[in-house]
UniProtKB/Swiss-Prot annotation:
Name of protein: C-reactive protein
Key words, A-Z: Acute phase, Calcium, Disulfide bond, Metal-binding, Pyrrolidone carboxylic acid, Secreted, Signal
SMART domains in the cross-refs: PTX (SM00159)
GO CC terms of this entry: extracellular region
Chief location category: secreted
Gene: crp
Top-rank lineage group of the source organism: Eukaryota
Amino acid sequence: MERFALWFIFLAGSLAQEDLVGNVFLFPKPSVTTYAILKPEVEKPLKNLTVCLRSYTTLTRFHSLLSLATSNPLQDNAFLLFSKPPNQCSIYINQEENVFKVDPTAVEWKHTCVSWDSVSGVVELWIDGKLYPRTVSKKASSIGFPSSIIQGQEQDSFGGGFNIDQSFVGEISDVHMWDYVLTPDHIQKVLFANMDFNGNIISWRSLQYELRGQATTQPKRQCKTLEHHYGLFAKCYK
């Protein structure tokens, strides 16, 4: 009984599921041991996908925002959202890289959404509500499972193979994943933090996760003003 109790305490300390609205994942330093593991609500092949998140960093080098690998050793980049400052972003779908030229951004919160439809192969990248020219990747395929979904590192193997030069340093918040392609109207709802519109695969409102190394959850202290785009302000947490 004592061993069972100790094991339960260990699990409770290493695995959490909670509403993280108003909070961030903080990755304070370059490292290969600091990262967050996200647990999907459902494990299944994904023929359609949308991922949205907010990020805040001063990094000027390449870094991963979200890495999804499968147990297939040939699919360490089944889905990868990879930033290449100052003006490129790469989206990997089943190992195929799709490079987008994007506007350079200042040091402020950035909202990013990526969607992929397997029937058409169309990949969309939205940054702060702006849709960049679309591309086509891996038509008629699917993203397999089981999956390892990690933030803070880029996986070169299932759950590992990290490179400190690709690690994320900064803050990430409002992470959501859907098993379908969001419409432009849905993208706008997510951009403006509509509390009634949350991911059905991963939801920041009910997130099961593990933090490793120096990664922590912290209250969100900054927000990005959207005044120059829309004459509005995004919601801030203090």
